[in-house]
Amino acid sequence: EVGRKCAARGGGIEQGTLSILLRVESAEAVFRVTEIIAASESVAQVGLDESDLSASVGISSLSEYDPFVYARGRMAIEATAAGVQPIGIAHPLGTLPRLLSGDDMLKVATDSKNLGLKGIICPHPSWVSSVNTAFTPTESQVDFYTQVRDVFAQAIAAGTAAVPFAGRMIDVPVDEWAKVVIATSTACSLRDSEKQTALEAASA
């Protein structure tokens, strides 16, 4: 870690601005993923390299079944617990990437999000729009969950931890999910702003 910081300074990289994306490539790495994440405070994201992992455990990649349900799930949970982003894509595109229609790509990206993953590395520009759509909460979702937070706060103030709203029962787990949706929307907006600033700086 000390050597990395010195190298970064020597290369003109401002301290605290370097982010590391880890790729888990072996059976041992899956088993020790928490330890690997903890090796540097600069680790920001971690994902499976499913092609190398296939070789490590002697698996032939086939579209008919997903051999990495456990590995992907463990990585997602361990990364989230460590406060870094788990990234990756639902089977079979992790080992057998290919071009898909916009709708098909949106489904795969949505499946990936629902596996606990927080982003996807896009090897082709055609993936980007569908991936962004899948991982970004819609305005209606943000509006709904903002109302959920308001309604739940009022319920807590009134002395109850469960209240009906819009045909649903709002309780602590729903309020916690509302926090996640709103925080994700805020993070996506911030990243879009950062990208726009970078594009403007590059074209100046």
Descriptions of predicted regions:
Residues 1-204:
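Expand to "…catalyze enediolate/carbanion chemistry for C-C bond making/breaking, isomerization
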